[in-house]
């Protein structure tokens, strides 16, 4: 349960080129910079907004994390990237005004205007984004050569996050937003969601036109954005069993019925024993005696079809626990896409070697 994901309640993209267009149910979220869109237009940009339920955030912190040290990350998964610079930076801020997602899509004819856009917070002609005389600690950013708007956000230095992508780097967004989430949880600021934007905008340079597109909550793929919570739930309460200290050794995973409903919680037991146990005089078989894996042991979960990590190895947040029976870990199935198969991997350190064990242990999440 040391990794738990919640999903957005609403998201949309704001385009300076189309200042009244709403894209609330588009499958794509986009942050981009366009130069020379036509001979008469100035550089244009786009930003996206994404919001998560305050009730869900509070529930996770109060009832699941329950006092442990935790971290939260905004995760968005890339759909397409073009014209990337050698380094492109994205920024994340907490939005300072409320907004409405709407039901538009990019390119709708006629244009849908029933939700947030570059100019408006709700629908065309309703509440405009503040563009001057900002409340203390908030700001906006736009070019005088385009329509004013584009959202407003808090500018306290601690309430921000960023990520820089090198040309060959993974382009998925994975930004630590713990301080922002904490501010929402404590009601220091209202939860109006995140705004994600490029660090450099409105630059009139034909060589700087990065487009980064991410899957939205309305995607028909297995890659919706999420707010991922991680915390250390490791408990070391060892009994009389020995620890594995030498190679080779064998590992098996028990208490895996193979099928789980979304939202269920399962404790997977990890049994280990030396491949060639030392012979002793006893009546029980040496091959039935369990051992603990070293305390520096971790689990990971992969999607069986895509071979991508859904939960990656993490020395702080996916560490195995120990009780009098065995090593183990507990897993909450809430963040897993239903009707898919997943693989369990174990990583441990023995005799100074980092060993990753893939023994083809699978499970499936089903709709319940």
Regions found by a protein language model. Name each.
Residues 289:
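Extracellular attachment/recognition segments
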Residues 52, 331-334:
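Hydrophobic core positions of the immunoglobulin-like beta-sandwich fold
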Residues 326-330:
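Short S/T/G- and acidic-enriched coil/turn segments that sit immediately N-terminal to beta-strands
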Residues 350-368:
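Short beta-strand elements
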Residues 195-199, 334-356:
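Internal, hydrophobic beta-strand segments that form the core of beta-sheet-rich folds
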Residues 1-259, 264, 271-276, 285, ...:
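Secreted, disulfide-rich extracellular signaling modules
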Residues 275-282, 292:
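Extracellular acidic loop/turn motifs
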Residues 294-298, 342:
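Small/polar, repeat-rich beta-turn/loop motifs that tile beta-strand-dominated architectures
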């Amino acid at each position: 349960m040391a990794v738990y994901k919640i999903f957005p309640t609403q998201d949309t993209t704001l385009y300076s080129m189309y200042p009244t267009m709403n894209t609330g149910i588009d499958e794509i979220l986009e942050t981009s910079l366009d130069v020379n869109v036509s001979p008469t237009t100035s550089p244009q940009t786009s930003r996206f907004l994404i919001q998560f339920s305050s009730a869900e955030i509070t529930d996770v912190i109060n009832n699941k994390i329950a006092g442990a040290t935790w971290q939260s990350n905004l995760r968005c998964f890339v759909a397409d990237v073009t014209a990337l610079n050698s380094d492109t930076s994205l920024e994340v801020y907490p939005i300072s005004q409320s907004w409405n997602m709407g039901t538009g899509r990019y390119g709708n004819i006629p244009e849908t205007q029933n939700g947030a856009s570059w100019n408006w917070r709700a629908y065309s002609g309703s509440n405009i984004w503040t563009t001057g005389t900002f409340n203390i600690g908030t700001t906006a950013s736009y070019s005088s050569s385009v329509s004013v708007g584009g959202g407003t956000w808090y500018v306290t230095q601690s309430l921000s996050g960023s990520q820089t992508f090198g040309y060959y780097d993974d382009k998925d967004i994975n930004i630590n937003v713990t301080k922002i989430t904490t501010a929402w949880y404590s009601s220091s600021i209202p939860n109006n969601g995140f705004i994600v934007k490029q660090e450099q905008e409105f630059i009139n340079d034909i060589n700087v036109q990065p487009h980064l597109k991410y899957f939205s909550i309305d995607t028909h793929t297995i890659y919706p954005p999420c707010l991922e919570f991680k915390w250390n739930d490791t408990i070391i309460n060892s009994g009389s069993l020995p620890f594995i200290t030498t190679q080779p050794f064998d590992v098996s995973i028990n208490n895996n019925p193979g099928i789980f409903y979304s939202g269920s919680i399962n404790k997977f037991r990890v049994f280990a024993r030396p491949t060639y146990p030392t012979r002793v005089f006893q009546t029980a078989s040496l091959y039935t005696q369990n051992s603990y894996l070293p305390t520096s042991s971790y689990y990971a979960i992969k999607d069986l079809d895509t071979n991508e990590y859904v939960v990656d190895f993490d020395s702080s947040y996916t560490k195995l626990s120990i009780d009098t029976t065995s090593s183990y870990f507990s897993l909450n199935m809430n963040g897993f896409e239903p009707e898919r198969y997943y693989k369990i991997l174990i990583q441990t350190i023995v005799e100074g070697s980092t060993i990753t064990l893939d023994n083809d242990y699978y499970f499936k999440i089903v709709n319940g």
